[in-house]
Amino acid sequence: MVLLQLDPFLNELTSMFEKSKEKGSVWVTLKRSSLKSKVQKRKLSSVGESIEYRCLIRATDGKKTVSTSVGAKDHQRFQASYATILKAHMTALKKRERKDRKKSTEAEKKESTSTTKSKKL
């Protein structure tokens, strides 16, 4: 697993989505992390210092795994870029076109009445 900076991570994520466009999947996980060992956490908590938590983001296509760590300062910029990438590559999640039940039953009634009138003439 490779820990990348924000922009290279987003570039790799884009390439993963493009490679899996025809066939395959991309999994993205987000997790709260302090990136410190348990011993360091205990020392900080005993001293009374607060631990700065970051967001650990991992992406994999089954073969290749990349990850990055996002702090509170970079969160808004990363979220905007991440949302843009997801919107661009989630074409399979388009809304289905559904027939409205009321409209379809009314249309069927109109068709049936018009065909019966034409038969009478």
Curated annotation (Swiss-Prot):
Ribonucleoprotein is among the record's keywords: yes
Keywords on record: Cytoplasm, Ribonucleoprotein, RNA-binding, Signal recognition particle
Stored SUPFAM superfamilies: Signal recognition particle alu RNA binding heterodimer, SRP9/14
Gene Ontology BP annotations: SRP-dependent cotranslational protein targeting to membrane
One of the Pfam families matching this protein, by short name: SRP14
GO cellular component: cytosol; signal recognition particle, endoplasmic reticulum targeting
Start-end of Basic residues biased regions: 93-102
Region (Disordered): 93-121
Subcellular location per the Swiss-Prot or TrEMBL entry: Cytoplasm
Signal peptide residues on this chain, from the entry's feature table: none
Biased composition, class Basic and acidic residues, residue ranges: 103-112
Domain of life: Eukaryota
Sample GO molecular function, one term: endoplasmic reticulum signal peptide binding
General function of this protein: Component of the signal recognition particle (SRP) complex, a ribonucleoprotein complex that mediates the cotranslational targeting of secretory and membrane proteins to the endoplasmic reticulum (ER). SRP9 together with SRP14 and the Alu portion of the SRP RNA, constitutes the elongation arrest domain of SRP. The complex of SRP9 and SRP14 is required for SRP RNA binding.
Subunit-structure text: Heterodimer with SRP9; binds RNA as heterodimer. Component of a signal recognition particle (SRP) complex that consists of a 7SL RNA molecule of 300 nucleotides and six protein subunits: SRP72, SRP68, SRP54, SRP19, SRP14 and SRP9.
Family per similarity comment: Belongs to the SRP14 family.
Name of the protein in its database record: Signal recognition particle 14 kDa protein
Organism this protein belongs to: Arabidopsis thaliana (Mouse-ear cress)
